[in-house]
Amino acid sequence: MTKQEKAENQEKPTEETVEETPKKETPFEPVMEADEVEETTEAQAPVEEADDKLAELQKKYDAMEDSFLRSQAEIKNIQMRNQKEQANLLKYDGQSLAKDVLPVLDNLERALAAEATDESAESLKKGVQMTYDHMKHALEDHGVKEIEAQGQAFDPTIHQAVQTVAVDGDQKADTVVQVFQKGYYLKDRVLRPAMVVVAQ
């Protein structure tokens, strides 16, 4: 072969087919450069900051809601307490007046206990009786009632023992044997305890 033919042979590819081995496809993995990593970190920082702020705001909201609910409950309790106090004020309205009138009633009872010696004293006693009855009915109309004491078992919540005596005859111990001063209720409240003598 001449030099020329050799050169042509080298330039022509051989007709033998060479099978190329297929390459396995690998999944695409982006390769980040240093600048891109910094940008991603910088982008995540505001998101994390926003999440922190959101969590903080949620805590504040929860605390404010709790405070609001507690305040509402407290207001409701105050309203109920005020209603109860107003109801008691209306129920026991006139308590101080009734207390002030009781000594007058006591004096009228003492006047009625005195003996009338002549006609003028008897007519005066009738006038005192009418005044006493009228005053007692007026007090009863406003819820003032006499405390039953004579012969009753001693009760320290409604009786005030001023003296004790020995049990005599058929008397029972801890029984009221004498009333020095009548006691009164105003509705269901003790206005004045009865002053009594108790057998022991």
From Swiss-Prot:
InterPro entries: GrpE, GrpE_coiled_coil, GrpE_head. Residues 32-41 have a biased composition (Acidic residues). It holds the Pfam family GrpE. One of its GO terms (molecular function) is protein-folding chaperone binding. Keywords: Chaperone, Cytoplasm, Stress response. The keyword Disulfide bond does not apply. Gene3D superfamilies: 3.90.20.20, Head domain of nucleotide exchange factor GrpE. CDD domains: GrpE. Participates actively in the response to hyperosmotic and heat shock by preventing the aggregation of stress-denatured proteins, in association with DnaK and GrpE. It is the nucleotide exchange factor for DnaK and may function as a thermosensor. Unfolded proteins bind initially to DnaJ; upon interaction with the DnaJ-bound protein, DnaK hydrolyzes its bound ATP, resulting in the formation of a stable complex. GrpE releases ADP from DnaK; ATP binding to DnaK triggers the release of the substrate protein, thus completing the reaction cycle. This is Protein GrpE. It comes from Latilactobacillus sakei subsp. sakei (strain 23K) (Lactobacillus sakei subsp. sakei). The gene is grpE.
